[in-house]
C-alpha cells in the first residue's frame, strides 16, 4: 500500500525532516530477526523457551481462538469486562506464541498458522478491548480509535513481522500494512492533523506512555518511508511530556507500583525505540526528573521487596526487576549483569527489550543527574514530599522487625482512592495491616461516576476514620496538610491535618489531626493517633484493614497473624470502644475491615493504635 502523504500543521514539517535524517534507511524493530541463529539457538535451550515451544505445539493443534461477537458485546450488556478482554487477548497471545516458537525452532513448522493468524487479525475490525469501545465504532469499523490494546498489541504484531522478516509472504505483509494504516497510522494522523488529538496524547497517566510507545514502535518497525517514520517520532517527542507530568517532580508515581511497572516500562520502551532509531540523538532521559523517576522502583520498597499498595496497585506487586535493572544499567547506580529471557505472552511488546541483549542505551551523565543520584542514598527513609509519602525502614542488621509507609496526599490523584491518612505496616515479607490495594480486574463501571460506591476505592475500605457515618470526600481540596515531619535514625514522626478530607461531609468537624510515630528501638513500634474536635458530639470510628487472621486477646487488644508473622495492636481511647468486622472483596483477594468505634459521641477525643511484633 502506498505511503500516506504527510502535510499537517500540528507536527512541524521541519522537525520531521530533521528526524528523518537521523533514521536508518530501512525500518527496524526491537531485537534480532530469526536469521540470527547465534542468539535464537542459544535461547532455544532455556527452560522458558522449551516451555513456550511446547505450548506453541498445543496452540497449533487447538487453532486460533475465535473472535466471538457476543463476548465483545458482553460488557455493554452486563458491565463485566473480563469475558471480552480475555477473548481478545487469547487471540493475540496465540499468534505471539507461534511467532516466537518459529524463531526458536527455525523449521517453518508454524508459518502457515502464523499467516492465517495475521490474516484473521487483519480482517478483525476491532483491535481494542470492549471497555475502550463503548460506542462500538471500532467494532463496526466506522471510526477507529487507538487505545492501550491497539497500541500494545499492534506494536507486538509489528515486532513479530520484523522478527520473521522474509519468512512471511509478501502478500501477508501487504495485508498487515493495510490493516495498520486503517486501524493505527491513519487514525493517529487524522486525530493530530484533522480533528483533535485522542485524549491520551495530553493525559497525565500511563495511557500516554503506553500508547506512544506502541504506535511509535510499530511505525519504526513497519513504515518504509523515513519521513513517515519521522512523523511518529516527532509526535512522540511533542507529547511524551504529558505522561511525565503524571509523576511528581520528585519522582513519585501516584498511580501506584503496578502502574509504574506498566507506564514507566512503556516509557522505557519508547525511549529505547527512539534512542536506537536516532543513535542517541533524541533521548528522553536527559533530565534530572527522569533520574528521580528511575529511582522510584527502589525507593518505594519498604523492606524485603514489599511496597505499599496505594491507589489501584494490586496487593503483593513489587517493582519490575527489568525496570530496576535497566535503570541501574542506564544510570550506572549498581553493578549490572545483563540478563535476557523469553517473557510471558501478556503485553509482549512491553517486554521485548528484556528478551534481547544490548538492552539499555546509556544516558549522558550530566552534573544535574549526578547530583540527583547522590541525594537519593538513604537506607532508613524514602521521602516524596510533593505526594506526602514517607517510607521508614529498620537499619540493616538491627533487631527492628517493622517497616512502614505513611501517606498524606490528596483525593484527586491518578487512579485515585479516597485514602488521605493511609499507611502500610510490614513484618518480614507480609503487609500486616494498612492499605490493601486495588482490584485485580476492574468492574465495568469502575471508571465511571459510580466508582466511589466501591469500598476498595472509597475511604471505608481504607485504614482511616469513618465519622458520623461519612467517608472522605473526593477532590484535591481533600488533602493532608503536613504539620510535622521529623525523621531521625531512631524515631520518625509524620503529622497531618486532614480535616478537609471530611469537611463537607461532616460540617460539625473542626479539626482532625493524624500523627504517625515509627520507633526503631527493640523490635519496633508503630503508632497511629487521631485527635478530633467538633462543634458538637460526633460519632468517631477508625479502622484496621488487613488480610491477616485476627482475634481479640483482651478488651482493647488485637492480634494479627499472617505468613508466620504475628503483630499485636493495642487500642487506647477515651471510654468504651466497640468492634465490628466486615469483609471487603471487589475483584481482589478479600480482606477484613476491623471497625473500632467510640461507643458514645464526643465533641473531642483521640484514638491511638499501637502496633508491634507480638511477644512470646
What is each stretch, according to the model?
Residues 264-432, 487-489, 601:
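Carbohydrate-active enzyme catalytic cores, enriched for enzymes
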Residues 206-208, 259, 415-419, 462:
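Histidine-centered active-site/metal-ligand motif
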Residues 40-90, 100-104, 411:
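Asp/Glu-centered strand-loop micro-motifs enriched in Gly/Pro and often flanked by an aromatic residue
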Residues 2, 151, 341-347, 441-616:
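CBM-like, beta-strand-rich accessory domains located in the C-terminal region of large
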Residues 433-438:
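Catalytic Cys-His active-site segments of thiol-dependent hydrolases/isopeptidases
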Residues 37-38, 46, 85-291, 295-301:
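Aromatic-lined, polymer-binding surfaces characteristic
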Residues 2-52, 97-103:
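Extreme N-terminal leader/anchor segments
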Residues 71, 130-134, 198-203, 307-314, ...:
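Short coil/turn segments at secondary-structure boundaries
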Amino acid at each position: 500500500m502506498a505511503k500516506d502523504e504527510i502535510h499537517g500543521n500540528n507536527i512541524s514539517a521541519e522537525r520531521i525532516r530533521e528526524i528523518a535524517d537521523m533514521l536508518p534507511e530501512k525500518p527496524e524493530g526491537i531485537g534480532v530477526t530469526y536469521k540470527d541463529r547465534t542468539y535464537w539457538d542459544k535461547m532455544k535451550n532455556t527452560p522458558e523457551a522449551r516451555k513456550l515451544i511446547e505450548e506453541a505445539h498445543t496452540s497449533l493443534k487447538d487453532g486460533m481462538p475465535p473472535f466471538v461477537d457476543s463476548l465483545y458485546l458482553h460488557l455493554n450488556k452486563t458491565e463485566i469486562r473480563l469475558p471480552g478482554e480475555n477473548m481478545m487477548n487469547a487471540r493475540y497471545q496465540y499468534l505471539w506464541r507461534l511467532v516466537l516458537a518459529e524463531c526458536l525452532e527455525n523449521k517453518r513448522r508454524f508459518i502457515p498458522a502464523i499467516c492465517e493468524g495475521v490474516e484473521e487479525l487483519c480482517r478483525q475490525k476491532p483491535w481494542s478491548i470492549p471497555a475502550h469501545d463503548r460506542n462500538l465504532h471500532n467494532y463496526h469499523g466506522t471510526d477507529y480509535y487507538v487505545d492501550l490494546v491497539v497500541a500494545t498489541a499492534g506494536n507486538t504484531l509489528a515486532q513479530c513481522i520484523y522478527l520473521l522478516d522474509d519468512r512471511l509472504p509478501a502478500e501477508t505483509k501487504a495485508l498487515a500494512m493495510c490493516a495498520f494504516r486503517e486501524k493505527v497510522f491513519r487514525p493517529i494522523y487524522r486525530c493530530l492533523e484533522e480533528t483533535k488529538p485522542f485524549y491520551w496524547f495530553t493525559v497525565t497517566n500511563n495511557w500516554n506512555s503506553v500508547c506512544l510507545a506502541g504506535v511509535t514502535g510499530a511505525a519504526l518497525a513497519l513504515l518504509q518511508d523515513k519521513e513517515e517514520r519521522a512523523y511518529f517520532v516527532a509526535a512522540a517527542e511533542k507529547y511524551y511530556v504529558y505522561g511525565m507530568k503524571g509523576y511528581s517532580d520528585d519522582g513519585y508515581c501516584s498511580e501506584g507500583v503496578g502502574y509504574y511497572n506498566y507506564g514507566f516500562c512503556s516509557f522505557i520502551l519508547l525511549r529505547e525505540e527512539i534512542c536506537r532509531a536516532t543513535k542517541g540523538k533524541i533521548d528522553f532521559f536527559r533530565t534530572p526528573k527522569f533520574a528521580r523517576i528511575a529511582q522510584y522502583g527502589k525507593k518505594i520498597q519498604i523492606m524485603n521487596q514489599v511496597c505499599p499498595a496505594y491507589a489501584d496497585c494490586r496487593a503483593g506487586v513489587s517493582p519490575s526487576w527489568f525496570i530496576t535493572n535497566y535503570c541501574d544499567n542506564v544510570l550506572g547506580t549498581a553493578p549490572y549483569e545483563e540478563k535476557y529471557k523469553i517473557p510471558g505472552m501478556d503485553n509482549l511488546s512491553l517486554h521485548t527489550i528484556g528478551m534481547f541483549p544490548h538492552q539499555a542505551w546509556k544516558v549522558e551523565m550530566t552534573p544535574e543527574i549526578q547530583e540527583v543520584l547522590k541525594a537519593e542514598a538513604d537506607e532508613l527513609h524514602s521521602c516524596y514530599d510533593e505526594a506526602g509519602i514517607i517510607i521508614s525502614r529498620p537499619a540493616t542488621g538491627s533487631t527492628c522487625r517493622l517497616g512502614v509507609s505513611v501517606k498524606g496526599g490528596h483525593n484527586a490523584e491518578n487512579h485515585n482512592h479516597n485514602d488521605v491518612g493511609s499507611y502500610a505496616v510490614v513484618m518480614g515479607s507480609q503487609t500486616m495491616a494498612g492499605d490493601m490495594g486495588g482490584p485485580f480486574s476492574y468492574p465495568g463501571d469502575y471508571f465511571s461516576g459510580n466508582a466511589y460506591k466501591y469500598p476498595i476505592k472509597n475511604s471505608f475500605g481504607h485504614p482511616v476514620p469513618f465519622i458520623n457515618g461519612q467517608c472522605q470526600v473526593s477532590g484535591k481540596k481533600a488533602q493532608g496538610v503536613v504539620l510535622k515531619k521529623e525523621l531521625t535514625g531512631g524515631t520518625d514522626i509524620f503529622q497531618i491535618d486532614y480535616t478537609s478530607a471530611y469537611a463537607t461531609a461532616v460540617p460539625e468537624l473542626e479539626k482532625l489531626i493524624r500523627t504517625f510515630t515509627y520507633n526503631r528501638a527493640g523490635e519496633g513500634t508503630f503508632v497511629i493517633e487521631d485527635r478530633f474536635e467538633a462543634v458538637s458530639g460526633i460519632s468517631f470510628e477508625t479502622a484496621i484493614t488487613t488480610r491477616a487472621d485476627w482475634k481479640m486477646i483482651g478488651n482493647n487488644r488485637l492480634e494479627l497473624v499472617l505468613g508466620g508473622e504475628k503483630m499485636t495492636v493495642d487500642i487506647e481511647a477515651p471510654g468504651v470502644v466497640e468492634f465490628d468486622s466486615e469483609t471487603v472483596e471487589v475483584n481482589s483477594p478479600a480482606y477484613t475491615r476491623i471497625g473500632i468505634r467510640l461507643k458514645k459521641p464526643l465533641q473531642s477525643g483521640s484514638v491511638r493504635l499501637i502496633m508491634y511484633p507480638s511477644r512470646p
